């Protein structure tokens, strides 16, 4: 029977509980020398007290983590212009910079912060001397300033300054790449601390590890968090009743719902792209098999039927098929099942094992854990050509989760004999580590766009 439960002692209700300002600390482990140079000039602060957040530093870090940009260090900037009229275009183009972000911040009478910022096309500005003209509505030539890609003003409350910095990063990223930025997203993950009264904790943080919140704690294991497409809920596995069960929890209200509690194993929940179904794994018939569960009709449908183990389902972005890991060929490899016809195809052939697969939102690439002579590492496979690229050199990689724009991957690895979260750009150029200061971190799940 499906049960609706309030979390009670397991979840701290209302606003999510603040565990630490930044329990996950980003440490860059590999550079991006071939990335596109960009200038993020420190914003001018027109006040006497320190700002609650260094907006320009947050933006520079965001853009660097994408793997597509290499921000110029502040100590190597030829100047610090605070608006486009002060930009010396020749000075920046000599550094290879073709885009520059600058701005200013002041505080209004209500105590809020007024942020004025501009993204400048440095190359265009150099070509026109910042004085390009266009025909106005009356047919007269007017100054067009088409080297200013955007010029925006926003009023922001102090506690939301860091969030708004991510918003600016998204705008810059989309303007310069044509793709949506994913800096205003979150990650969910499980932290294990054997010395804590509740050693298993499900937490949520900004994608960069800041603003970490505790959403659930338990004396029994928690596993496999997965986001709903609207970013409101998490599906996860709990052992609180003595066996693996699947729950869905609203992370804002604290309400949760038990979905499955079949004999033996219930695991690996994953929302469908439309949010109407869960793919999951049950072993009620013996071996692990993939099922779908309709969240409206409560209908359970078996997808795989074999003597082998089939697990780790993940929906194709079009919702018409699932990929999953199976040992039907002897060792774990990744397969794809068409939900209409039931036909199954093997996707991975390189490496002795491939598991934990996810497909990028555009459907082009399969990201998975690939086992070779060098160990378990993240790899990316082109689904059209079959070409394989190993993305990481970390130890015992597992549980990859792709950003909603397909640009980055967060995963669990081993560092200093402890599970930590790591991050790699989808092209493998940028790598970082997000080590927790208070436990072993596993099973990351990247949120949808929020």
From Swiss-Prot:
It is found in: Periplasm. One of its GO terms (cellular component) is periplasmic space. Disulfide bonds: none annotated. Pfam families: PD40 (PF07676), TolB_N (PF04052). Residues 1-22 form the signal peptide. Gene3D superfamilies: TolB, C-terminal domain, TolB, N-terminal domain. One of its GO terms (biological process) is protein import. The keyword Cell division applies. Keywords: Cell cycle, Cell division, Periplasm, Signal. Belongs to the TolB family. Part of the Tol-Pal system, which plays a role in outer membrane invagination during cell division and is important for maintaining outer membrane integrity. NCBIfam families: propeller_TolB (TIGR02800). PANTHER family: PROTEIN TOLB, PROTEIN TOLB HOMOLOG. The Tol-Pal system is composed of five core proteins: the inner membrane proteins TolA, TolQ and TolR, the periplasmic protein TolB and the outer membrane protein Pal. They form a network linking the inner and outer membranes and the peptidoglycan layer. This is Tol-Pal system protein TolB. It comes from Vibrio parahaemolyticus serotype O3:K6 (strain RIMD 2210633).
